[in-house]
């Protein structure tokens, strides 16, 4: 186990050499002479979303810093193997947090320049807590994990209800697992099928206009076009029942109703897509947000993510709450 961890650390540094070699890469193309993005891709990352304040405006770690941080992370994980803790979670064997070795940025956020999310506007409402802990609030529940109670399914987070995956967006944001996506292409459509929750986003490339502004969708309405060898996808018409932006480690804020999302997909070598997105949401943030994230080619298949396999997990959550209420009455 330790030997594998050391090799993973060394891969961080060796990845820099591979990145330089990619300068000579010629983009493979489909039969329609479009850049070929087809296949299964993984967007895991061990880079934090926001830059730790100690790095200031520095975009990149030195190789020595990258090794030191990774070593400290592994040491903390090994030191935390406490047999007294509960077992209702996953261990590091199941977590997908390695990411591309050549991504040694200090943060996934590249704008603002400090690598941190811009301040929210005064009227932006925090719609959820960090780490999926239940909070007080009212319906609709716009965040992904956790909830505001257990009176009914509408009190639970969107990913608990198998409506929207907590990492699939759009946009993609790496989480602890299931950071996979499969891309299909035809001449006039670009199809993005996320592992969680097994949802396919069909992006027309035919220069058609967006749907009417009154029609609102969970994943918004996407339209794409080519900027040389980069695919640009613009998405709007999100509904007001999802958060504007947020992760397990960052506050979950606002609604997505006024959000405008621009994604850019660029092949940088045979095994990598540079994925970049910009969020503009004046109802939630005082400035735009840009994130850059490498996606790694996966030599394998994407299998169905069945969520609650019939959603009995949600049913049992509510059933357990009713039993606890009955037990309290019987005391």
Q: Where are the predicted features?
A:
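Bacterial N-terminal signal peptides
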Residues: 6-15
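Conserved small/polar residues in nucleotide/adenosyl-binding loops
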Residues: 1-5
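PEST-like low-complexity, intrinsically disordered acidic/proline/serine-rich tracts
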Residues: 19-331
